[in-house]
From Swiss-Prot:
Its main location: plastid. One of its GO terms (cellular component) is large ribosomal subunit. The gene is rpl32. One of its GO terms (biological process) is translation. It is found in: Plastid, Chloroplast. This is Large ribosomal subunit protein bL32c. Pfam families: Ribosomal_L32p. It comes from Tupiella akineta (Green alga). Keywords: Chloroplast, Plastid, Ribonucleoprotein, Ribosomal protein.
Length: 56
């Protein structure tokens, strides 16, 4: 089994964690906005079909 020869410094560990967390945060924000746009579009379509049904 592979074992590291030297201990990784705390600063390097924190740096890697920070990079990973920033990537995760960026993806979470992107997913939120995509879901938000999809929700708004769905609500708009429902409103339009509701208006069309009431006019008839």
């Amino acid at each position: 089994m592979a074992v590291p020869k030297k201990r990784t410094s705390k600063s390097k560990t924190n740096l890697r964690k920070t990079v990973w967390k920033k990537k995760a945060l960026k993806q979470a924000i992107q997913a939120y906005f995509i879901a938000s746009r999809a929700s708004k579009k769905l609500n708009l379509e429902k409103a339009i079909t509701k208006d069309l049904n009431t006019e008839s």
